[in-house]
Amino acid sequence: MSLGLYLHIPYCFSKCRYCDFYSRPGERGVPDAYVDALLRELHRFAPDAPLRPDTLYFGGGTPSLLTPAQAERLIRAADPVPGAEITLEANPETVTEESLRGFRAAGVNRISFGVQSARDTQLRTLGRPHSAKQARAAFAAARRAGFENISGDIMLALPHYTQAEFDETLELIEKGGATHISAYLLKIEPDSAFGKHPPEGLPTGDEAADFYLYAVEQLEHHGYRQYEISNFAKPGYEGRHNLIYWDCGDYLGLGPAAHSCMGGKRFCYAPDTAAFLQDAAAPIMDGSCGAEDYLILQLRLRKGLDLDAYKTLYGKQFSTAQLAFVQNCVRAGYATFDGSTLALTPAGLIVQNSILAQLL
């Protein structure tokens, strides 16, 4: 079974207005002491030999605030298996061709740019520190630096959103050479700046659903195959790290607020960088990974839930009433079901929570 390693880099220039992830804004780099703390935790979980993960993911925060030398220290210590996917999330304004060449030489082989929109006015509304021009330059620099596996993020249903804005953003990312695109509906989180002061011009729920379906249609038309609710890829470029999450595989998350699931057990670190640096934030047990997690995560994927595997792994099977509900979903265009695999359509993915409420 594959093992994923997630390294949380909480530092960032500024907090985006929609973000409620744990982060440390106002920083221009990553202290070496923080890298040392991550190395300490790597040794905690793999004291006798390197961890050797199948995927390694630098998430944040803004992981591109790492220096290539810092990234290389962490990659070498983890010692991923040959052919491992090693991803670095990056903000366009934080990278240069030189830094990207450094990350590539350090072992990073997949770069993920947080673009969100091709319109500068929208980027300012979101609190993003980059411009569309910087995003274009970042993609071009990544290609020159030798990256072939490049992902870009798009946010949907933003304030005063239009299909034309999506088209412009897709064009920027596609022309940038992206092999993978993540497209997320804006969600107003209570603890974010938008949660405290919602922006004007937000689409209605029905309008947001229409934007999502339009995005799926256009991405598929441009050769990006949907394989998960929010993720689309050229053939062979699906994100292997996140697939470990969605297939309920083992993953180890290190850093403040990072979550793990190893051997069916969940644990996490407290969202406290100071405590993490001082080795005062040992991981906290947080329940187990069970049948509900498996069903929820598998139904995020376009391949769907294999009912035979569900029964084999967890001894679970749908009741007569649940099977009748599934057939209703099929008739409504929300799902496909061949007797052994239940998969949600794009329309079904929009109402996934309502469907899950009947299946859990």
Annotate each language-model stretch with its function:
Residues A347-L360:
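Short, amphipathic alpha-helical interaction segments positioned at domain boundaries
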Residues P10-F21:
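Local cysteine-cluster metal-coordination motifs and their immediate loop/turn environment
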Residues R331-S340:
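A short, conserved structural fragment
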Residues K316-V330:
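Short amphipathic alpha-helical interaction segments
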Residues T341-T345:
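Minor-groove-contacting beta-hairpin "wing" of winged helix-turn-helix DNA-binding domains
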Residues M1-I9:
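Immediate flanking context of iron-sulfur cluster ligation sites
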Residues S2, S23-P47, R52-K316, F337:
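C-terminal scaffold of the Radical SAM
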